[in-house]
Amino acid sequence: HSAVAGGITAVCAMPNTKPVTDNQAVVGFVKRQGEAAGYARVYPYGAISVGQKGETLAEIAEMVGAGAVAFSDDGKPVESAQLMRTALEYARAFNVPIAEHCEDMTLARGGSMNEGIMSAKLGLKGIPAEAEEIYVIRDILLA
């Protein structure tokens, strides 16, 4: 209701739900629920990995067939370069985007803002730009 009241006519449903949108049954459920509500068009994202755990590739082909428009482990980086490489290969084959959460948690964990003069002045642990850049560069090379 809120999206439509604000003039929004379409929304992307991210996969970080319970249950995680990591298979065709959940993708189909999300689509049907959106259609039944009839307010805004709902475009489901599928998870890249099963359970958004970053261990096993989710069934991308099946989720595309069920209506997934893109893939993401929404809020969680895919740490495995091999898993991301395979996901990107599927994305290319099915012409769907991957929305990666680019953040190296070994650098970012515990950070609350961008690293810099202000984080130092406030005494807060900053997140270095490299935490994002490492994953961006990796994924560009893998793509």
Give the location of each predicted region.
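Structural motif
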Residues: 14, 45-47, 74
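Histidine/acidic residue-rich metal-binding segments in metalloenzymes
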Residues: 55-143
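Alpha-helix-loop-beta-strand connector modules within alpha/beta enzyme cores
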Residues: 24-45, 89-100
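Active-site beta->alpha loop and helix N-cap motifs at the rims of alpha/beta catalytic domains
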Residues: 47-53
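Surface-exposed, flexible loop/turn segments at secondary-structure boundaries
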Residues: 19, 50, 106
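Divalent metal-coordination and catalytic microenvironments
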Residues: 3, 7, 42, 71, ...
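Gly-rich Lys/Arg/Thr-decorated short loops/hinges at beta-loop-alpha junctions or inter-strand turns
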Residues: 8-13, 39-43, 115-124
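Metal-associated gating/positioning segment near the N- to mid-region
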Residues: 1-37
